[in-house]
């Protein structure tokens, strides 16, 4: 079998799962090509970065299996026939009037006002589909509305009804169990708890609420479309089913062998699909993996449908740093689209690839994003020179491309923090931004902003949407005459030393060397003396000198890194503001 793209072999968690998935697939269907992995997403509101783990975990495993030359299908089951449970807060174009649709299938709920999409589910699905395309995630999408309403699962539904007592007996083992005491965790805020919600209604009615016995099937009402229905009678031979709606009082008798307006309850629906699709690998969120949860119960119910439970790691929570400051209109839970506005898809893929599914991690929307980018660029350099550790190199390979090839990358990936500072100071003036970026490396200047894109655009979007106004950099229009007049002789001397060497050091590296060198030279040491050769007071002198420069240039104690700031302000203006 041909190897499509280089496999990273057994160096990280992804390759270990790929080994298991290939072996398990062969055990279940010897000699049959094709491996099936799955994700489930409920488009009940904005699909956020916690849900993205539901997709990225199987995607990375599927991609590794594909790199080894196997056929793979990554199914994304859109749980769009789930009931509409609540009106999410903070969604533009949605008000309390949407509460009247609670209980209907998500595909029967109107889309938010102004949406080009036909219904609620399609509206939220579309944003996720676009993000997955940008991230290079290949998948086969399956609408559960389409599956149920076209009768695809008819045999499975009739089979579940026939074996309802067996299903009830399995569920009954868990109904009386008390939930175990939860391990104490740091309290999560409401938005984070919402972000931890998985697909499918984890706490949904399991079909045992009716007085006529247990039924694993719930019709949607033929009059009001809601699932507030109770099955009151069912005949196995004729498949005649009678239900009554508690919302509107409607009741009818239908033939289940012909009726397509209802679904299996979640704890039965999920294992039915494992068997139907032959799923070998599907992860589950914390809410689906606890004792008595859908994943555990499903492992027993799947046998009734003649299938086996997939290999399925439980994935941990994805947190957000900078959540409070986020201007997200989503009621505080950012989506993959929000992240992709401020970071390249490679960085977002890397955050999911480098941590095992059971490790939680945070995605940065605050200053931390600059540090993450520094870390990514260092890894990029190590991979290029062959010094990266195997697991780090594997995560990098999974981030930059898939079995289908490399993702488009920024031709000249200049440091993110530099790009952010330049975007901050130039405030949308592209000609100024290009001038500054062209001076970063005079020996090899960039000729067009396109060379720094899309990274430049992401950094600019971050500055404009996630950096509070009081942290933005505003360069002084006029010199601070009062401060300049009050300076003592050592301070004046430090400014003279800086200005004298400005022209000769006018590049990012040159200015970095120069601003750190001035306090050393002033104290009688060579500019290139290392910290080990210097007394500790030099560090204090450097801090004092930097604070003085910030005050004279931007009127604050701190700001962007000085070399970037000096380049951004430009030589002539620096000389004016420093009193030359």
Swiss-Prot record:
It is found in: Cytoplasm. The gene is lysS. It comes from Streptomyces coelicolor (strain ATCC BAA-471 / A3(2) / M145). Belongs to the class-I aminoacyl-tRNA synthetase family. Keywords: Aminoacyl-tRNA synthetase, ATP-binding, Cytoplasm, Ligase, Nucleotide-binding, Protein biosynthesis. GO terms for molecular function: ATP binding; lysine-tRNA ligase activity; tRNA binding. Residues 196-209 have a biased composition (Low complexity). Pfam families: tRNA-synt_1f (PF01921). Residues 178-209 are annotated as: Disordered. The keyword Transmembrane does not apply. Gene3D superfamilies: 1.10.10.350, HUPs, Lysine tRNA ligase, stem contact fold domain. Its EC number is 6.1.1.6. GO terms for cellular component: cytoplasm. InterPro entries: aa-tRNA-synth_I_codon-bd_sub2 (IPR020751), aa-tRNA-synth_I_CS (IPR001412), aa_tRNA-synth_I_cd-bd_sf (IPR008925), Lys-tRNA-ligase (IPR002904), Lys-tRNA-ligase_SC_fold (IPR042078), Rossmann-like_a/b/a_fold (IPR014729). This is Lysine--tRNA ligase.
